[in-house]
Amino acid sequence: MLFRSVRHECCYWSSLMALALAKTACDDPSPMKIAIVNQPQDPIVAGEEQRGSVAIVNWELAKRLAERHEVTVYAPRAPGQARSERWKNIEIRRVSFVAKLFHKAMQLLAGRLGSQPPYINSPLYYREYFLQVASELRAHPVDVLHFPQQLQFAADFKRAMPRAKIVLHMHQDELAQLDYDLLRSQLANIDSVVTVSDFVTDRARARFPEHAAAIHTIGNGVDVGRFQPAHQQSNGARRMRLLFVGRISPDKGVHLLMEAFDRVARERPDVELTLVGKVGMLPFDLVSLLLNDDADALDSLRPFYGHSTLAWLTKEVLGQKSSYKQQLDARLSPQSAGRVHFVGSVSLEELIRLYSQADLLVLPSIWRESYGLPVAESMASGVPVLASDCGGVPELVDEGVTGLLVPRLNVDALTNAMRELLSDLSRLRVMGQAARVRAERLLTWDRSAERLERVYLDLVNSASIQRAAIG
């Protein structure tokens, strides 16, 4: 009896001590060792602008986390890059591999065959890259491992670092779309999931209610110091400038934008459109996965990929860029064609300049944008947004205040909204001012990094409590 009493007393005081330690850790967190894994397609260039949305997100978060923690970023090694280097407080470790063309070919072939899961979610997808990263982590363990999308490699990371907390960063909606049993087994190796929007979070929680408490929205952000409104322009006669930023592809609804712009441009000789981004097409297996519960949207995209093998080879492999671009050009009349400018990929400085000159950003996506970085960039630049009312975009755009939202696939609604906004310059300016205020308040990288840091701390502190209680 005495032994039992003493044992209970010890357990009681151990629990109190663990809670005290946890509170101290939350009030004054000790630096954590954090590893952030980048996608295999996107090299990281120290101290410079990054290419690819996931690389941008990872780098912006890493810069802020490194102010208080030890951060290592893992990335593919591009020609001429050092194997490792240090930039300010960030350690960059790079992994070399040579099978990039193989994986691109496999992704195209899998898309044609309609394989599920898509190649991007298969165990073969850039496997040598992720296994090399896991090997590096085994030699350089961390408290928290943060990696994007490819949860098929979570078990490899867990084996490399059994005590590390594994955080999966979802930039798309795969948790609501991939095979349930496959995901359930893979999620067993994940300690927490962070997402870019409530849209992704809510759908993941609904499908996996047992993991709901471990799924968190951290959002993305924008550098409000670099993306800023331009000085007010005069009310004199000038061109009205529309802007599109993103991949020039069917899923982004650029063909719908061409139709709507052509209608407006026939009526308004003062309107022009600039499109920023590469022309290309997502693999159809990925498109069909993310739209597998949306037959209308998926059916609208099928013709761009071709039904026969010859059509597929022509459109998606040999003529991926020229095929879609030709279809876009065909939707423009001679009166409007000269006022549409495809500028391709541009530098960050040029992108900022284009935002500063724009009157309206138009993003008529057909697939459900999980977030929409161009929307945040546009709002920070004081430019209102006209976008599809789906995915995570409605979380960014305050309807009627910072822009307008229209139904997907509805060219008439897109055209009418464009006419409505372009006919009232003062309204556009008021919307732009409201967009800037909203971006400063809700859409900063600092806010996203703080949310992510809280997730990390909760995971690490809970592990400390468990170890203290056991001890």
Predicted features along the sequence, with ranges:
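Acidic donor-binding loop of glycosyltransferase active sites
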Residues: 356-370, 383
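Carbohydrate-associated surface elements
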Residues: 199, 221
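Conserved acidic donor-binding segment of nucleotide-sugar-dependent glycosyltransferases
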Residues: 399-400, 404-411, 420-425
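Short hydrophobic beta-strand element within catalytic cores of glycosyltransferases
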Residues: 384-387, 397
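Conserved donor-binding/catalytic core segment of Leloir-type glycosyltransferases
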Residues: 194, 234-252, 257-262, 273-281
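Nucleotide-activated donor-binding/catalytic signature segment of Leloir-type glycosyltransferases, i.e.
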Residues: 277, 286-349
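N-terminal subdomain of nucleotide-sugar transferases
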Residues: 16-81, 88-91, 164, 188-191, ...
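A charged, aromatic-enriched C-terminal amphipathic alpha-helix characteristic of glycosyltransferases
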Residues: 124, 426-461
